[in-house]
Amino acid sequence: MKRTFLLQIAMIIVAAHACAQQKTDVQAHRGGRGLMPENTIPAMLHAVDLGVRTLELDCVISSDNKVVVSHDVYMSAAFIRKPDGTDITKEEEKQYALYTMTYDSIRKFDVGTKPYPQFPEQAKMKVYKPLLADLIDSVEAYVKKHHLKPVYYNIETKCSPDGDDKYHPKPDVFARMVMDVIKKKKIADRVTIQSFDVRTLQVIHKTDPKQTLALLIMNKETFAANLEKLGFTPAVYSPYYLLVTPELVKEAHDKKVQVLPWTVNEVSDMEKMMSLQVDGIISDYPDRLVKVAGSYQQK
């Protein structure tokens, strides 16, 4: 009898843990750059296969006003090669500002074959920076073809006050261009717009008040101080993971704000974040995170 009782208790604990796992939003940082070339269509499809709920990605604007998926506002020397196959040097990388280049020229640069020492597990392949519209089309078609649950998107606007009209348009124009793509693709209810720059969030909060917004945080100021700068309460507060404390999580949850730490790559840190009851985790290694938090696609 005692053994049966203990077994029942163990089963309840396991079931409760499984439920908790399914509540954690597993997000593939730049599509999971620890495994695949960052911010590319192959990375996103691979992340879907792994079982993530959300694809995290970044956007910039080209000279011909196309919304391009890219973290950097220029061609990074760390992992990009020129169309002729030669490496971009650190000294010249900022000469290749994407806002000064047409998308046709951007697409000719190889972002997937150069060895990337920071991510030794990353698969190597010749691939390019995609348009946001094309990435969404590819993911949506893939999900439909394989009869999967619809996935979500967490899209960062890569902008800053000192980059206006140099690396990107002003925030109102930037925000409108990104939202135009999202609305055209009819996925707004599955999209979060995130930014360190409060300006694009403020614009979208006014023009599209129902759009889910996330404030990215890297500073050590208080939750209240950061929200005061923003001017409204966002749906999501997304701090660097070492800034997450039990007190921060409670303060955010008391205001009905989700906490989404970035970028969490070690399993021990993932487990710690989950123990703090964060709402989601952004990771370069979604394979590790899925093992800890469970698969979104698991039936």
Where are these regions (language model features)?
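Phosphate-group recognition and catalysis centered on beta-loop-alpha active-site segments
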Residues: 19-299
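Bacterial Sec-dependent N-terminal signal peptides
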Residues: 1-23
